[in-house]
Amino acid sequence: MQAKVPETCLLTVRVLRASGLPSKDLVTSSDCYVTLNLPTASSHTLQTRTVKNSRNPVWNQNFHFRIHRQLKNVMELKVFDHDLVTRDDPVLSVLFDVGTLQIGTQRQSFSLGTQEKGCLEVEFRLQTLTDCEEQLISNGIVVARELSCLHVELKRTGDPKRSERKVQLVVAGACEGPQDASAGTGSFHFHYPACWEQELNVHLQDDPHEQLKVPLRTLPSSQLVRLVFPTSQEPLMRLELKKEEGPKELAVRLGCGPCPEEQAFLSKRKQVVAAALKKALQLDQDLHEDEIPVIAVMATGGGIRAMTSLYGQLAGLQELGLLDCISYITGASGSTWALANLYEDPEWSQKDLAGPTEVLKTQVTKSKLGALAPSQLWRYRQELAERARLGHPTCFTNLWALINEALLHDKPHEHKLSDQREALSRGQNPLPIYCALNSKEQGLSTFDFGEWCEFSPYEVGFPKYGAFISSELFGSEFFMGRLVKQLPESRICFLEGIWSNLFAASLQDSLYWSSEPSQFWDRWAQDQANLDKEQVPHLKIAEPPTMAGRIAELFTDLLTKRPLAHATHNFTRGLHFHKDYFQNSHFSAWKASKLDRLPNQLTPTEPHLCLLDVGYLINTSCPPLLQPTRDVDLILSLDYNLYGAFQQLQLLSRFCQEQGIPFPSISPSPEEQRQPQECHLFCDPAQPEAPAVLHFPLVNDSFQDYSAPGVPRTSEEKAAGEVNLSSSDSPYHYTKVTYSQEDVDKLLRLTHYNICNNQDRLREAMHQAVQRRRKRKQFRPE
């Protein structure tokens, strides 16, 4: 939706009085004041005066806000007891939905909500502003408002020595934050909400009382305005100000369906899929376009184990002629490494996978000591310093990304996510989608707050908010839906670092205690020896000694903090919420957080994203396939968990049930739980809109006795069928970064075999997907 909406109002809030407030002081009554915060109208927290020594304070103060009624305007009112010695004590906190107000005046009484009988009385007055219209762009969940840009040029006047004094320029609520400069030098710009009552504040850092305040609404648009500063003494500099309208077009796509590029890809891919299905299923006739099912591969995480297994399974699908039947491949954590490697070749699925598999073997079996060689560490440092210079936030995940690249490759790869578009240009390969989880850096676990973020060669975005950007712009700075600073696209290794930073926790601690590579790997191994099963690790990790190891010291100036999560510029920053966002079906399908009813605390209010490996919540890459607009019929679930063949799939099913997302119930029998088979089909005839799931857990069943489907093992071949997948000393534990040649060969053969040995079930499931499409076609109205 994009329109001029004449629903701007003036909200006057009169804080009247409070009564019966409890005393927070030992001897006297409280000294109370009230704060008001309305982020959709102002970046400031406003405050009443303090009324001393009273349980029944009277303020009778007015505050004014310019609001738009199409937004979700939630005001936070807080009462505090002022204290000269300690932190001010909170007395009352309340959230008030301004959208419940009608035009006119209304009084509200907010109780303490405890056994106390005290309350806060506030009067709200809402008036329509008929001469003020604002253009809003919305998808029904988030809203982009009008943007203004202020250009500031500082020019020196007078004595050059005096111009060495430092000044600070601030536009509260602007994207850029405070800007520091020497008096009379520098050029700056500020992006800020056009509808707010903003001002430019200039002050001397050694004399904060010497200020210049310029109300920005009074500045004429696109005209140069000259001022001098300071005004109370001989001027140090001249300011040249120019206010302009910000970009009208958004760089963030607000929409809940596939982007035009994905739709164009699917149109091409359908032809490949239709031909492959006709051949694989031996159909007599060509499939009509509305009979072609959407079939997807969903791969979980699991480090080197997941990467290796996915190679084996894709080779199996290719051998059966079924790989061209796939429209999407989704990956998480370790399986993203396989996809990132394969998609460097635009024709990978049309070629024999033996070549890429040999490269994989070389990397998986090589020594990893070189990843922390002095020359490598210096290279990491140089690249991190260059990224910081360009404007990328620094965090430990960036260092992990470079180390991980060295573990998986012999030299740096210049490949970027957007480069993978070439592999989709003719629909010749499935569309890859990589998954991550967005969380909060402080105070909340991923179970309290976790949002699915998807990465494709076309876009990166949040289905929950219907907000997406072109993949080459990920990492650049955005504000209110507009691109304000474009940074060079990161190499894909930095994205792999995000998608797989589950492994960075142990690596991070090992790094901080180690002085040389051998100590690092010894500590890494020691940390893993205590794990008897794979568990979801906690984000909080122990702090190192004051004197960190020499390896860590090389990066202390770049990584002053140790956040595990990847900090990157938030492309949803500055977007506001539509008044009915919570009822939107696309938002409600993914709301799973205690914060989802609190728009002032959701992701668009944060300057940075906090992106994590999905393994911190559920080890799955399925959510992108559950978007109703993708309309997936069949999911081939490739699960690489060593403990619990159905555990992660059951967690996903439970999540979908709670969210009302169509998905079959995952209820394996006790026998299946005890002895999982190579392949399990889950479907729900009562939910025709739910995809069928053909689940391939990582198990060693008939492979023990057969070297190939229908070919029994000889006594000499029995050892080749022994694959350790269950015990705590499995060579395939997710923390293992090096495999023996024998172990990697066994895992590749096992996963390839499990696909090929179930070719009949695969073909039958695909046949049912075709039938499902045909049934829907019959019942579709003309």
From Swiss-Prot:
Binding residues for Ca(2+) 2: D25, D81, D83, D89
Keyword Transcription: no
Catalytic activity: a 1,2-diacyl-sn-glycero-3-phosphocholine + H2O = a 1-acyl-sn-glycero-3-phosphocholine + a fatty acid + H(+); a 1-acyl-sn-glycero-3-phosphocholine + H2O = sn-glycerol 3-phosphocholine + a fatty acid + H(+); 1-hexadecanoyl-2-(5Z,8Z,11Z,14Z-eicosatetraenoyl)-sn-glycero-3-phosphocholine + H2O = 1-hexadecanoyl-sn-glycero-3-phosphocholine + (5Z,8Z,11Z,14Z)-eicosatetraenoate + H(+); 1-hexadecanoyl-sn-glycero-3-phosphocholine + H2O = sn-glycerol 3-phosphocholine + hexadecanoate + H(+)
Boundaries of every C2 domain copy: 1-112
Residues that coordinate or bind Ca(2+) 1: D25, D31, D81, D83
Cofactor: Ca(2+)
EC number: 3.1.1.4, 3.1.1.5
Activity-regulation annotation: Activated by cytosolic Ca(2+) in the presence of cardiolipin. Activated by phosphoinositides. Inhibited by electrophilic ketone inhibitors.
Effect of K52N: Impairs calcium-dependent binding to phospholipids
Mutation effect (R49N): Impairs calcium-dependent binding to phospholipids
Residue ranges occupied by any PLA2c domain in the UniProt entry: 245-782
A single GO cellular-component term on record: cytosol
PROSITE patterns per record: C2, PLA2C
InterPro entries according to UniProt: Acyl_Trfase/lysoPLipase, C2_cPLA2, C2_dom, C2_domain_sf, cPLA2_C2, LysoPLipase_cat_dom
Membrane-protein topology: Peripheral membrane protein
Keywords associated with the record: Calcium, Cytoplasm, Endosome, Hydrolase, Lipid degradation, Lipid metabolism, Membrane, Metal-binding, Mitochondrion
Residue numbers annotated as active site: S333 (nucleophile), D613 (proton acceptor)
Domain notes: The N-terminal C2 domain associates with lipid membranes upon calcium binding. It modulates enzyme activity by presenting the active site to its substrate in response to elevations of cytosolic Ca(2+).
Protein's job: Calcium-dependent phospholipase A1 and A2 and lysophospholipase that may play a role in membrane phospholipid remodeling. Cleaves the ester bond of the fatty acyl group attached to the sn-1 or sn-2 position of phospholipids (phospholipase A1 and A2 activity, respectively), producing lysophospholipids that may be used in deacylation-reacylation cycles. The PLA1 versus PLA2 activity ratio appears to depend on the phospholipid headgroup, with mainly PLA2 activity toward anionic phospholipids such as phosphatidylglycerols.
Name of the protein in question: Cytosolic phospholipase A2 beta
Gene: Pla2g4b
